[in-house]
Design a protein with these regions (language model features):
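Conserved donor NDP-sugar-binding/catalytic core segment of glycosyltransferases
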Residues: 1-39
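Short aromatic-enriched loop/helix-cap "lid" or pocket-rim segments at secondary-structure transitions
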Residues: 25-29, 126-127, 133-136
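A recurrent flexible, glycine/aromatic-enriched loop bordering the glycosyltransferase active site
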Residues: 41-75
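Conserved hydrophobic/aromatic beta-strand scaffold that supports enzyme active sites
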Residues: 13, 73-75, 121
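A short, conserved alpha-helix in the catalytic core of glycosyltransferases
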Residues: 73-85, 91-111, 116-117
Length: 183
């Protein structure tokens, strides 16, 4: 959470990567047997995505944004998410919904801040989602790119009251950023 706060900037969303943990390690975490994870533990996959190296994060961030976003490690400003109407709920099953949201954010002027090597999260093991709709999801994603879409039709506004959709932004809150934040 601290890394997300350090990377938070108005007009930007933050995306990071994740380590993946096995079914056995997930059971131990959920039972409380293990309360802290490290990249080199047995049962951690994608360990290169679970390493926290602040200097590398700074260097990687300067290389520019990536389209490979992971919804399990993203953060947005509320008003930016409302502007693009949140996740497109017409996506079915697994695949491309996170990337499609990132495209709409980018198209609407909200820039990505890559947080690789910071903001480490671990993805708990779960059953595989059906991927029968992957080709339809890919087409929806490509259509958003082609048409330079900034909003989806079926999204967040279905769940918000009218005042939530049109309210003025909250007063600006300044988040103190330590001098050592690496920006």
């Amino acid at each position: 959470i601290q890394d997300h706060i350090l990377f938070a900037r108005e007009g930007c969303y933050v995306s990071g990567s994740r380590g993946i943990i096995t079914e056995m390690l997930t059971r131990k975490v959920l039972s409380g047997e293990i309360t802290s994870l490290t990249p080199l533990m047995r049962g951690v996959r994608n360990s290169n995505n679970a390493i926290r190296i602040p200097l590398m994060a700074f260097l990687y961030r300067t290389l520019g944004p990536t389209r490979f976003v992971k919804g399990c490690n993203m953060a947005f400003w509320r008003n930016d998410l409302i502007r693009v109407n949140g996740y497109d709920e017409s996506f079915c099953g697994w695949g491309r919904e996170d990337s499609e949201l990132a495209i709409r954010l980018d198209n609407s002027g909200v820039r990505q801040r890559c947080m690789k090597f910071r903001g480490v999260v671990f993805h708990l093991h779960h059953g595989k989602c059906e991927r029968n709709s992957l080709s339809a999801n890919e087409e929806r994603y490509q259509q958003t790119i082609r048409e330079h879409r900034t909003r989806c039709e079926i999204g967040l506004t279905r769940h918000l009251g009218e005042t939530d959709q049109t309210r003025t932004p909250e007063p600006e809150v300044k988040i103190p950023v330590p001098a050592s934040a690496g920006h």
